[in-house]
């Protein structure tokens, strides 16, 4: 099997990618869609259904894309121009035209990384640096974590001495060093500058974090990091008869995820009488109408699946570092003066929402180390709010929503907010919400992946009992989660189960 380069694929499919009268495909997406075309062509060459006489006859009666007859083969220029070169013997180009129209309309191309699959299974590998000599040991901590600071004593004093962890009711000794793991920032070492007893009611991680921060702000506990004394370092690892003093070690592991192609399929049956009457009365073709219905429904369902998985895998907003003290976690309440920061009119309260969105976007960068959030999925009402407010540093003006498209009959892409966030409308939202996400400059830099395998397979037959025609479509694709997406889980084994969401 010959593997084509990116340039070769773009050159081969350029006429179809840039065909006059076809919906425009952004340059950044052309290489991906060219790969999808290549996978589709490979399926044409091996699958018999594309050469089935009845399917070819049905498609030939209504599709305007090129249908190549005899042994001519086909080329992208003919498909793009809608030119036929002979009697219909196979429908590959016709299906390719349908793929060309439908695939770029998937929302996955805008908010997911798109990685076309070459086979029904794919693999994602993640290399992780780990503290300790056994990278797969239970409780092994991941190093170089974007969310958690380094263990600043691991190569220093911490290698020679184990420090006690702070807990509820701990009584400190002046000058002693203690350790604590903050949920949001990781391991720290704290030296007691005064005698203090940790509050006995700090009996869970959140309360303990708050209590220790209070003592740090009071100056009772001071963050510290030190190397070991030379006299200690000289005796490390059994030197000169010393014992129980090994060097601290680090290692790495390579985790593998498997992504498997799954299928969607729909069929439609109709009577000969319906087809005849539809053609005679309305001048419509039953095959054409039903094929459009089936293909559109499959596309809408994939769009819904992608949005659902993004919302399901996202963290609850307005929590942790993005929660304003005194306000309710997970909810931005326009009736809460803390959330809207004492706004005097609606325009000011809308600007408070913009600030909350910025906080969520920055938190994505802190937790992933990749970049700030750059797209938003939101319900219609939220998009109307975003469209109605001035995003500049100015008076909080409020007016008609003229800046965005909020009509989902036209497009689910609303526009660009403040020059930095691409906004998409969830037209089927059950309640008002917004989700902030990040997709980087290339298709590998995303939190979730859409992996198309075979974009569209047409099927046609007749019911053996009543001889009425039946037609159907299949599509195969995978959905994968970035192995680094769950940033807060520092122990790698806890989040590497499978690349498939479940």
Swiss-Prot record:
Q: How is it modified after translation?
A: A proteolytic cleavage by the prohead core protein protease gives rise to the mature major capsid protein during virus maturation.
Q: Which residues does this entry assign to the site Cleavage? A: 65-66
GO cellular component terms, semicolon-separated: viral capsid
Instruction: Give one Pfam family.
Output: Gp23
- Superkingdom: Viruses
- The family this protein is said to belong to: Belongs to the T4 phage capsid protein family.
Its biological purpose is as follows: Major capsid protein that self-associates to form hexamers, building most of the capsid in association with pentons made of the capsid vertex protein and one dodecamer of the portal protein. The major capsid protein self-associates to form 160 hexamers, building most of the T=13 laevo capsid. Folding of major capsid protein requires the assistance of two chaperones, the host chaperone groL acting with the phage encoded gp23-specific chaperone, gp31. The capsid also contains two nonessential outer capsid proteins, Hoc and Soc, which decorate the capsid surface.
Q: What is the protein name for this chain?
A: Major capsid protein
**What organism, scientifically named, is this protein from?**
Enterobacteria phage T6
């Amino acid at each position: 099997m010959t593997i084509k380069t990116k340039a070769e694929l773009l050159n081969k499919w350029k006429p179809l990618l840039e065909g006059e009268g076809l919906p425009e495909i952004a340059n950044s997406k052309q290489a991906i869609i060219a790969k999808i075309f290549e996978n589709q062509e490979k399926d044409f060459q091996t699958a018999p259904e594309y050469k089935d006489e009845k399917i070819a006859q049905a498609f030939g009666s209504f599709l305007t894309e090129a249908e190549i007859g005899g042994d001519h083969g086909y080329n992208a220029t003919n498909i793009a121009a809608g030119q036929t070169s002979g009697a219909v013997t196979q429908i590959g180009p016709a299906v390719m035209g349908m793929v060309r129209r439908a695939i770029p309309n998937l929302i996955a191309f805008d908010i997911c990384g798109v990685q076309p699959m070459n086979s029904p299974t794919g693999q994602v590998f993640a290399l992780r640096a780990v503290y300790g000599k056994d990278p797969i040991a239970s409780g092994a901590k991941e190093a170089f974590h974007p969310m958690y600071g380094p263990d600043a004593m691991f190569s220093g004093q911490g290698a020679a001495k184990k420090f006690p962890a702070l807990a509820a009711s701990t009584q400190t000794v002046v000058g002693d060093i203690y350790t604590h793991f903050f949920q949001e920032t990781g391991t720290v070492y704290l030296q007691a500058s005064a005698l203090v007893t940790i509050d006995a009611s700090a009996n869970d991680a959140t309360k303990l974090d708050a209590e220790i921060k209070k003592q740090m702000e009071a100056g009772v506990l001071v963050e510290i990091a030190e190397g070991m004394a030379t006299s200690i370092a000289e005796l490390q690892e059994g030197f000169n008869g010393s014992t129980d003093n090994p060097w601290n070690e680090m290692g790495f592991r390579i985790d593998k995820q498997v992504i498997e192609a799954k299928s969607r399929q729909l069929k439609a049956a109709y009577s000969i009488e319906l087809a005849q009457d539809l053609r005679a009365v309305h001048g419509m073709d039953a095959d054409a109408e039903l094929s459009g219905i089936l293909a559109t429904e499959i596309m809408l369902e994939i769009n819904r699946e992608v949005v659902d998985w993004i919302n399901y895998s996202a963290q609850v907003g307005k929590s942790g570092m993005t929660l304003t003290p005194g306000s309710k976690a997970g909810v931005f309440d326009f009736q809460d003066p803390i959330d809207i920061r004492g706004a005097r009119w609606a325009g000011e309260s809308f600007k408070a929402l913009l600030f909350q969105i910025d906080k969520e976007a920055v938190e994505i960068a802190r937790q992933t180390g990749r970049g700030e959030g750059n797209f938003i999925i939101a319900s219609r009402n939220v998009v109307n709010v975003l469209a109605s407010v001035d995003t500049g540093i100015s008076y909080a003006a409020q007016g008609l929503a003229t800046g965005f498209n909020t009509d989902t009959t036209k497009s689910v892409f609303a526009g660009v907010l403040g020059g930095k966030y691409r906004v998409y409308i969830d037209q089927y939202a059950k309640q008002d919400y917004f989700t902030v996400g990040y997709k980087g400059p290339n298709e590998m830099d995303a939190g979730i992946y859409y992996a198309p395998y075979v974009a569209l397979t047409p099927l046609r037959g007749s019911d053996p009992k009543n001889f009425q025609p039946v037609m159907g479509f299949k599509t195969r694709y995978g959905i994968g989660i970035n192995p680094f997406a769950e940033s807060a889980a520092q122990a790698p084994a806890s989040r590497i189960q499978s690349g498939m969401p479940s």
